[in-house]
Amino acid sequence: MTKLITTVKEMQHIVKAAKRSGTTIGFIPTMGALHDGHLTMVRESVSTNDITVVSVFVNPLQFGPNEDFDAYPRQIDKDLELVSEVGADIVFHPAVEDMYPGELGIDVKVGPLADVLEGAKRPGHFDGVVTVVNKLFNIVMPDYAYFGKKDAQQLAIVEQMVKDFNHAVEIIGIDIVREADGLAKSSRNVYLTEQERQEAVHLSKSLLLAQALYQDGERQSKVIIDKVTQYLESHISGRIEEVAVYSYPQLVEQHEITGRIFISLAVKFSKARLIDNIIIGAE
């Protein structure tokens, strides 16, 4: 039976007792509205750790002025049921007032890693992400924390934060979970029309095209970007917002490809903005 914890104080009390007994803690931070991608991370943690904690907290700091914090889907009862079915031990669901009891005296700024891709479109977003993850790590004190590679920029930023702040946690990146036809699973997929849902499969297919070009020896980013863009333009009605090639995890834009790279897509359909990516090349 999964236990619901709603206060920072109680969560810290449980964690301190667990640490004294040598218990390993796995942690999956989420904003709720859970889907199979989240549950894959929970299963991975359950198979590895003595205790698995899932946080469900809609973090106001990562919402911009034109993003509706109040409209973000909240379904704690459903989320609790889902993680219970896959073996999570604790759901940590604090109130905003408990996580942020007063105005923050210290702001965390991410730096260059947040100046590109999603961060460039949502100024301050990753500052909010890093602030809440930093706080959650201090509260939960996990041995392992699980993040999806679908949000690859976020994963790179969290890994850098752990290094810079000397957190005693190992970050585990979990591969993108996809539908049978290749579409990356996302809570946003429900907003697609039937036609858009049929078209959306071409995001992952365009990434496979990029991978094939790379494997055939193509190292000019512009060639890959142009061919992926042309493919998408001929297969989807949505607006292509981004096709980009960056080094990973440094997130430096690439022209002549060397080393490990991250090919990122963003497409805006009528009521849903979908992202997808592929990481390829030697580390």
From Swiss-Prot:
ATP binds at residues 31-38, 148-151, 177, 185-188. Disulfide bonds: none annotated. GO terms for biological process: pantothenate biosynthetic process. It is found in: Cytoplasm. The keyword Cytoplasm applies. Beta-alanine binds at Q62. InterPro entries: Pantoate_ligase (IPR003721), Pantoate_ligase_C (IPR042176), Rossmann-like_a/b/a_fold (IPR014729). Keywords: ATP-binding, Cytoplasm, Ligase, Nucleotide-binding, Pantothenate biosynthesis. CDD domains: PanC. Pfam families: Pantoate_ligase. GO terms for cellular component: cytosol. Pathway: Cofactor biosynthesis; (R)-pantothenate biosynthesis; (R)-pantothenate from (R)-pantoate and beta-alanine: step 1/1. It catalyses: (R)-pantoate + beta-alanine + ATP = (R)-pantothenate + AMP + diphosphate + H(+). Its EC number is 6.3.2.1. The keyword Nucleotide-binding applies. (R)-pantoate binds at Q62, Q154. The active site is at H38 (proton donor). One of its GO terms (molecular function) is ATP binding. The reaction proceeds by a bi uni uni bi ping pong mechanism. Belongs to the pantothenate synthetase family. Homodimer. Catalyzes the condensation of pantoate with beta-alanine in an ATP-dependent reaction via a pantoyl-adenylate intermediate. This is Pantothenate synthetase.
